[in-house]
Amino acid sequence: MAAESKRAVVAATAGNVAIAVIKFVAAAMTGSSAMMSEGIHSIVDTGNGALLLHGLRRGARPADAQHPFGHGMEVYFWSLIVAMSIFGIGGGMSMYEGINHLRHPAALQNPLVNYIVLALAVVFESLSFSVAWKTFRRSRRGRPTLAAIHHGKDPSLFTILFEDTAALLGLFVAFVGVLVSHLFHAPLADGAASVVIGLILVVAALWLAHESRSLLVGEAADPELVAALEEVALADPAVVGLGAVLTMQLGPDEVLLNIEVQFTPGSPVEAIHKAVHRIEQHIAERFPEVSRVFIEVEVPPAAPGL
């Protein structure tokens, strides 16, 4: 899954570089505030793609003495930085540009250039969104989109999905702003569109920050995975029950499991050791993402006289 996420990030970043260039050229030629905001948006998305790739690379490093559980949470940290970047740079600068245009409106020049650039941008963003959506769809496990995002453990993937969705919405708003400004000679519409684009970025950033924060502070594994792990433990003939089943997501594809397993009263030590080994082996075979397994043994003493 990590390789697919990286491919989606690379596709989005490459597209954003090309889009940013043509948007800024169009903004310079036409004086469009909305197009300038879209250029800022694409530059921010390009930088964010680089940050996500940096996070994926650092998160893939093996465990060491200082980080015995690995570096998988690096991805969560850099996703939070991306959210702050979208909020502060993307949303803030777009709104500033729009408000400045509202205070000092100016008529559009060469609006046809804007239409051509917006059409090209839609093509590039749609291709990027298609790659991200296909990757996301394979990981959603039949859940509704919003639920799949909430339960998702790979922020690099849903970050790109957020960015591409916000980009397509922003392009639509920019088109409406340019069209109204052009047809009705209303330059204020162009500035208003820039403010709306900024608000879209702020909302996307806040949502992304919320999801990244939850993962960064230590989120449990997917409920379906937890239930499946419980089934594996209970399926062993020596196990009579379970105590606490604690999980934590250590990275997009890494899970820590701490499980209390209850055995038959008076079970011999050798039988318990074999059962623990079987459970660990079955978990490793079925769920390779569960990289850290800690089994706590609970054996009530045998009843007196037995």
Predicted regions and their residues:
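Alpha-helical transmembrane cores and adjacent cytosolic helix/loop segments
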Residues: 1-223
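Peripheral (non-transmembrane) domains and long loops of multi-pass membrane proteins
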Residues: 1-5, 205-306
